[in-house]
Amino acid sequence: MHWGFVLLFVYGLLKQIDSLNQLEDSSLLKFEVVFASVFLFLLLIRFIYMKTTQQSSLPESTPKPQIMAAKITHNGMYICLALIPLTGLLIGLLFWLGLKEGLLTNLVVGAHELSVSIIYWLIGLHILAAVYHRLKNDGVWSSMVPFWKEK
């Protein structure tokens, strides 16, 4: 499930639009709405699944600040992963309503861009933490990555 989301997110990045004017193509606008809606639905399912069935793989000896950093990073990733399609849907709605420019559109576009920027940093931090745990050989890596398992 984790790696499926990685692929879905990367696809979303690769197919992103370069300009709001591209949304004048109604088939592209519809595709963006469907993609964002499906992404949000799958994100919600994943969030519920993870919160109800999974426990942290951090060892009990993990320092409290590190546990807090992991929680902040994970929750921040979920928030950004939700905000990106939500703000994208709002951009599409505003565009569809004819509000292609103006303060409201600029605010929503700014929130969208900020969410994307923050998720890049959080993903980087997530990867650094995974590598740290791989080097530490404490079992966390093996719970995150399907290859190069710890012994």
Question: Where are the language model's segments positioned?
Answer:
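Membrane-embedded alpha-helical bundles that constitute the cytochrome b-like, heme-associated redox core
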Residues: M1-K151
